[in-house]
Structure formats: C-alpha cells, structure tokens
Amino acid sequence: VLVFIETDNGLIGVGEGWTPGASPKALMQTIEEDVGPRLIGQDPRYHTKIFTEVWKTTALNARRGILSIALSAVDLALWDLVGKALQAPVYQLLGAFTDQVPCYASAGLYGKGKDETALAEEMQGYLAQGFSDVKMKVGGVSLEEDVKRVRAVRDAIGPKARLMVDANYTLNVPKSLKMAQAFEPYEIYWLEAPVSPDDVSGQAKVNALSPIPVCGNETETGIDRFRELITHRAVEFVQFDIAACGGISEGRRIADLAAAFHLPCTLHASSTGI
C-alpha cells in the first residue's frame, strides 16, 4: 500500500506499507481512520514527535500487526517530506555514513519443472546484472533435493559471491540443524527464518548450535520484539523491514540496539521499489 501525504505548500511525501498475508484494504482503512487524522495540522519536520505520540495513543491496540505497518507507511512518507523540503536525500538526514550499499538478489524460488540447471542459470543471471550476492529459498522440498539445489547454485556463482538461504519459517529445530549441517560444505552466509517466528527459544537454539548463523526476522514489528530476539541471541544478523517494523524512525532504533550487541543489520525490502 502506498501512502501520499501532502503539505499546505504542495509538497508530497510517499511511503509504503508491506502487507504480507494481510488485506491491503484493511491497511488502507487503518491509515485513513486511525493514523491519518492525527497528522492533520502537524509539522512533518517533527516526525519523531508525531511517531511517538501516535505510538503512545495505540498502547491498548495490537501494535504488532497492521497498525505498526500503517505507522511505517506514514513514517516513511514524513521522512520523504522532510528530505524534499530540505532538498536532501534521507540518507544524508540520517548522518550520511555512506552513499552506497551492497545489494543481493532474493530469488531462487521453487517452480514446476524448474531443475537445478535452470536455478543455477537464474542465479548466475543476477550476478551478471550487478548484484553482489544471491539468496534462495529452501525448506520446500526434501533435504536431499535442497542440497542438490544449493550445490548447483554454489557451483554456478563461484566461491566469491555470498549465498544465503531462506526457509521462510517452515522448519523445526531438529530439521533446521540437520539442514545447516548438510549445507555447511557450501559456505552459506546465513540461514534465514528457520523456525516459527513465535519460537524465539527454538531459534536461539538453532543459532547456538548451527554451523551457519541465523538471520531474522523481517516479519517482526517494533523494537521490543527485536530486543527479545537480540537478548536471547536468536539471531546473528538482525533483519527488519522499514515498511513494517515502524518505519525509518523505529528501524533506526532497532539498528542502534543491534549495534550495542555488536550484531550487523540487513534490511528486508518490499516489492514496489519505493
């Protein structure tokens, strides 16, 4: 869902809300009825104040779901407005640590009739397009078949490119550990979302015992959930989506928390390109 916020001088900020498994119509209604009215008459330069006030007024509501996504979309639009008003990109407003970031291609999906050769050619193609690394799906077929898929991709992309795997929360602890051990020879950079996002203790066990570090969890919202993942050492790579976690404002807090525990962050990206 895209959000457009217009100021009285005609500037328009654009934000995005990620709705995995949820109705875009429900998100639109939440933005229009619960969040949007609180923005009328506000100064977008005070976006942190706006975010905090709206967050506080939702203390009795379900923050982890669609409301957090609505706040994310609005927060992104407010940051965009401020950048346009100051004629500066948002990365400069955040301190301009760097003006470029490495990008990997998240692909390698399962498909009818898609064998290892087709998968390998697909992943090679992303490197040819300029992506530095690639990520592929696992956990949707037998472990033996997944090993063949991973081996084919590693052989195709060579030893220098990073290869990540994403199980999309489909495994349990024993299966996750068995998979990690089977994938170890192929130098997997991270194992993403191995178990249910509700099983923090299980994910912590996987992270502690797996030869491949765990990455997660892009479906979480708000710093409190990420604090639980981090303090339980359930992740080695902290992954959040600014179109769901609470926007740039909350994402920055999550990144600062991860830094305090010496954990790197990686951003999950929504699909519109905005």
Language-model regions, residue ranges each:
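Catalytic core of soluble alpha/beta enzymes
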Residues: 136, 141-271
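N-terminal small/glycine-rich loop or linker at the start of catalytic domains
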Residues: 9, 89-111, 149, 156-162
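Short, Gly/Pro- and small/polar-rich lid/capping loops
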Residues: 1-4
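Active-site beta->alpha loop and helix N-cap motifs at the rims of alpha/beta catalytic domains
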Residues: 107-120, 143
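Short, charged beta->alpha transition segments
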Residues: 89-93, 118-125
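Catalytic domains of carbohydrate-active enzymes, especially glycoside hydrolases
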Residues: 122-137
